[in-house]
């Protein structure tokens, strides 16, 4: 009984010692409170609208007819596309894309209206800059849709001229109606997709770094013997007493981001808030365990922090966040089954 009481006393003393160290170094306050809060607000406000709106695009209208002007107006009506400039030729539009003034341009050839009415299949072209993946993809989608709508409108006019009714024309143009239902993120909101991964990922990375630093600085400052002696020469009590205050702080920060995302911003959460909070607690504990392994593998502060930062950054990529796991190399797919993420 006395031995157990000594363990509890030693654990409490180590926790008190660690709390004093936490409040004595501003670095802990920054990494455990200020940096997570900044990342929460930064990422959620950066993508506040969900999808980029009014991406700058250009138009090269060589036809300059009522039909071509109507096409340009309809293209500008898309929420993701904003027609900001008209160019007299393709060369000027290409230079504007290369200079970053626009992300793409829509080319309407001369004689479009006349060739469409005479059924000579005029060609509409559009060019998007895929160096910017999201902007290029959104503009490509809108311009492709505009091209399909233009072709459908021309075909519908021909069918009307041949005496077809509206139902007959629409049945010919679209024999099968597609009804799409995106699951879990029906708004196709980039903020929902990115913040659900980035925010816990950043928190995980900070836990790695703080755990490695808090143990590594004991080795660097030669206070590890004092720390171990205070814990009754038990490495388990030493680690538990040192990391429990960190666990409490990081868990509170985890609860905050869950309430912020799913309660305040109303992100979709099919499981409910309490399973997510429990998963956050598991994330905090697992990240601290990884931090212990990192500083134990490379027991110097510099190498331990380098290991933690490298592992954390690689975890983003290999978890399938930026590239689908099923499309990776089979060797990497096997590694994704392991708890890198």
Language-model-detected regions and their locations in the chain:
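Residue-level recognition of pore/gate-forming positions within transmembrane alpha-helices
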Residues: 36-37, 145, 201, 246, ...
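Membrane-interfacial segments
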Residues: 46, 50-51, 159, 215-223, ...
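Membrane-helix interfacial "entry" motifs
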Residues: 17, 21-24, 185-194, 230-242, ...
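Membrane-spanning alpha-helical segments of multipass transporters and channels
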Residues: 43, 64, 95, 248, ...
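Short helix-terminus and kink motifs of transmembrane alpha helices
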Residues: 106, 141, 209-217, 222, ...
């Amino acid at each position: 009984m006395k031995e157990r009481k000594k363990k509890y006393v030693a654990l409490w003393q180590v926790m008190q010692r660690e709390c004093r160290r936490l409040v004595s170094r501003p670095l802990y306050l920054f990494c455990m409170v200020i940096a997570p809060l900044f990342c929460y607000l930064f990422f959620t406000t950066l993508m506040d609208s969900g999808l980029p709106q009014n991406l700058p695009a250009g138009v090269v209208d060589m036809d300059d007819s009522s039909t071509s002007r109507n096409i340009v107006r309809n293209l500008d009506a898309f929420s993701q596309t904003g027609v900001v400039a008209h160019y007299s030729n393709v060369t000027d539009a290409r230079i504007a894309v290369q200079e970053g003034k626009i992300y793409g341009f829509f080319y309407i050839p001369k004689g479009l209206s006349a060739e469409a009415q005479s059924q000579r299949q005029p060609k509409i072209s559009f060019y998007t800059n895929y160096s910017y993946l999201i902007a290029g993809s959104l503009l490509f989608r809108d311009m492709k849709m505009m091209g399909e709508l233009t072709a459908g409108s021309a075909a519908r006019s021909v069918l009307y001229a041949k005496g077809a009714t509206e139902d007959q024309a629409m049945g010919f143009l679209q024999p099968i109606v597609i009804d799409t239902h995106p699951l879990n993120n029906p708004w196709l909101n980039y903020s929902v997709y990115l913040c659900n991964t980035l925010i816990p990922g950043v928190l995980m990375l900070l836990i790695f770094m703080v755990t490695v630093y808090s143990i590594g600085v004991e080795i660097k400052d030669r206070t590890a013997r004092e720390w171990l002696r205070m814990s009754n020469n038990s490495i388990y009590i030493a680690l538990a007493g040192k990391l429990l205050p960190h666990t409490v702080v990081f868990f509170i920060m985890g609860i905050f981001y869950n309430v912020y995302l799913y309660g305040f911003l109303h992100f979709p959460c099919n499981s409910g808030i309490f399973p997510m909070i429990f998963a956050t607690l598991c994330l905090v504990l697992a990240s601290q365990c990884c931090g212990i392994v990192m500083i134990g593998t490379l027991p110097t502060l510099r190498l331990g922090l380098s290991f933690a930062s490298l592992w954390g950054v690689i975890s983003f990529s290999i978890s399938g966040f930026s590239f689908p796991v099923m499309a990776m190399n089979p060797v990497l797919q096997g590694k994704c089954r392991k708890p890198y993420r």
